[in-house]
Design a protein with these regions (language model features):
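Phosphate-binding/catalytic loop of phosphoryl-transfer enzymes
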Residues: 1-28, 143-152
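ATP-binding/phosphotransfer module of carbohydrate and carboxylate kinases, centering on a glycine-rich
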Residues: 25-154
Length: 154
């Protein structure tokens, strides 16, 4: 993942901001929303893919195992979304990378914001927008490629 604050990439004190896997226990690691585990579950259902790039290219929302995987990872996904909402208070959370768009929409459909909007002093708390990126797997490359230009021009 990545964190953008005021239009700038936030790297954190040790350059690892956005490494969300660290928030899960050892027992939860295989149930976190990581595409490598969906690929394993699909293989157990007879759909063998050689990697995440093939998942992105060939994805079908009706494959056996997809709905079960989404249900399995939903608790960890929701913890992640709620942790981001509670600690960073983002205006938006963007789903991108190699995740197929229909799968991103499925995950978004499981979102449960656990804290009430009026949790503090009667002030309405806004939910972040949940957005599916159009950049696909090119997002990290495009972002990295833009950094030298940003440093030169801005």
């Amino acid at each position: 993942g990545g964190i953008i604050v005021d239009g700038e990439l936030f790297l954190g004190g040790n350059m690892n901001a956005g490494e969300y896997s660290g928030m899960f226990t050892e027992d939860e690691m295989s149930r976190r929303p990581a595409l490598q585990f969906l690929i394993e579950d699909l293989a157990a259902n007879g759909i063998v893919l050689s990697g995440i790039h093939k998942l992105s290219e060939q994805y079908r929302d009706d494959w056996p195992g997809v709905a079960e995987w989404v249900e399995k990872v939903a608790p960890q996904y929701n913890r992640l979304v709620n942790a981001l909402w509670s600690t960073i208070d983002p205006q938006a959370i963007v789903f991108g990378g190699e995740m197929p768009k229909p799968l991103a929409h499925r995950l978004i459909g499981t979102t449960e914001f656990r804290m009430m909007r009026t949790a503090r002093y009667g002030i309405e708390r806004l939910f972040p927008k949940l957005i599916v990126s159009d950049l696909g797997g090119a997002a990290p490359v495009l972002g990295a490629a833009s950094l030298p230009f940003k440093d030169m021009m801005f």
